[in-house]
Amino acid sequence: MKTRISWIFYCLVSFMLLPSLSAAERFVTNESNGFTWIQQGKAYPILVDLQEDKGVLRAVANLQTDAGKVTGATPEIIHSPSGNRMLIIGSVENSSWIKQLMQAGKIPAADLKGKREKYILQTVKQPVEGVEEAIVIAGSDKRGTIYGIYELSRQMGVSPWYFWADVPVEKHDIISIKDRKSTR
């Protein structure tokens, strides 16, 4: 009997700790620190390669819509650099922008090459000519890139259950991304 109670207690504690082990590091803040992507109704654009997989392009379009729902500001999706700050999103497989950043040593190739379903999100200073700073979401493959995009949406305040269960979107005036590298 004592063994059974110990076993039940062990199982309950394990199930309570399990969600905290899988939770992604919090990289989005609603204060004006780090890389401020959206503030006062203005958003920096999202740069994505047209050669990117259709699933990634759809996730980028969803991110654009989600940003509008959260802040009221809808970022523009662009295919060549424009302006001094932006989000750069792509996979190692298909994005010329991500390949260029890896070749220049601005994002670590070792974190992505040969990996499956992995992404990094990090701030990069002067990622391409004419751009002062960017947040880069780079995936090892299509799924990794999509995971990174939807993790950003989730941390902004859009529940994965928004579409299916009508979970309300958290409204914020500011979306900032902390100056650090996040991987998953």
Q: What residues fall within each predicted segment?
A:
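Contiguous, structured surface segment used for ligand recognition
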Residues: 23-182
